[in-house]
Amino acid sequence: MTDLPEKEGGRFHASVLTLYPEMFPGPLGISLAGKALAEGKWQLDTVQIRDFAEGRHRMVDDTPSGGGAGMVMKADVVARALDSVDDGRPMLLMTPRGKPLTQERVRALADGAGAIILCGHFEGVDERVIEGRNLEEISIGDYILSGGETAAIVLLDAVVRLLPGVMGNRESGETESFETGLLEHPHYTRPQEWEGRAIPDILTSGNHGAIDKWRLEQAERITRERRPDLWEAYCKNRRKIGGQ
């Protein structure tokens, strides 16, 4: 396994390979990610895949071998685009057949030098370039999007907020859903009562130990009810830590 490059000036460097570079930075140009981008805390560039196509029509796709609907992105074109930015950063392909994106993988990416992200289109990408360039296939959910650009934006937003100096309150990032293995507890703020619903008394008691206990109990309840898969993994990890 080759060593990953050092972060340039401590910055996370994302290169997005796409047929629609005008979609970037998009939402990544506003809020936390946009401010961090403007301040140089991370770097974003796009690569137009079509620039690496040959011939008068600059075709980036062709019909699927063996027949079938749709078109497939060509291995030679995609490979040239990938090779143009290959510097040792992980190469990711956003695809519904990929491994589900997890907070653990997001943290690992945030700790690295960056990522090269290929946005798929049409029926997919020729399998040979996936194998030949060792692309890591990542999915953001069990549903189909028009292309990988939206998925790439989701991934980068999740990564950027974990970069040093991006979030004003480090604790915020450490207590959110998935960081503890649990979904997040409920939140409340003023007014004290709204439409007959009051803030739970415990949250205004000033007893921080009791508040922490309440929040954990609520997080456990919500996770158990809504995400049995996460709850099972959480319980398994607790048993492992407890040596049971």
Swiss-Prot record:
Its EC number is 2.1.1.228. It is found in: Cytoplasm. It catalyses: guanosine(37) in tRNA + S-adenosyl-L-methionine = N(1)-methylguanosine(37) in tRNA + S-adenosyl-L-homocysteine + H(+). Its main location: cytoplasm. It holds the Pfam family tRNA_m1G_MT. InterPro entries: Alpha/beta_knot_MTases, tRNA_m1G_MeTrfase_C_sf, tRNA_m1G_MeTrfase_TrmD, tRNA_m1G_MTases_N, tRNA_MeTrfase_TRMD/TRM10. GO terms for biological process: tRNA N1-guanine methylation. GO terms for molecular function: tRNA (guanine(37)-N1)-methyltransferase activity. S-adenosyl-L-methionine binds at residues 120, 140-145. Keywords: Cytoplasm, Methyltransferase, S-adenosyl-L-methionine, Transferase, tRNA processing. GO terms for cellular component: cytosol. Homodimer. Belongs to the RNA methyltransferase TrmD family. Specifically methylates guanosine-37 in various tRNAs. This is tRNA (guanine-N(1)-)-methyltransferase. It comes from Brucella canis (strain ATCC 23365 / NCTC 10854 / RM-666).
